[in-house]
Amino acid sequence: MLTNVIISLPLVVFIPRKTKEDKLFALNLNNYRNAHHFTMNNAKKIMKEIVERIVEGVIFPDPPYIFSYTIYPESARKFDLGNVAPGIQKFTDDALVELGKIKDDNYKIIQEVHYYFGGIDKENPRADLNIQTRQ
């Protein structure tokens, strides 16, 4: 079984709408706090579908885990790492639990979480999640 898993996650999701253009939803704490519950639920469902495609067939190591998120934004515009990474983490952790990839997202299962700035990537803005087991 693997002791290290790396998955690439989006920084935004697009929420489909019937009569208007799809809504861009940034996965950050501001939106997590302020979005309407209907919008939030749609974003969560879409993120779960994305995570499901990414981790299909991946066997996760046994817990406890250390999660490290490395953020690669699209532009050099300043952003708050503590606003972006926890939003992505919340959506991802919930999806991994719902998909049965990890048992829970409490402190006994995920014992450490780290956030890093990885540099600008105009071609592929993303958050890379490195899941390691605690030895």
Residue ranges and their predicted role:
Residues 1-135:
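Catalytic phosphate/metal-binding cores of nucleic-acid and nucleotide-processing enzymes, i.e., regions
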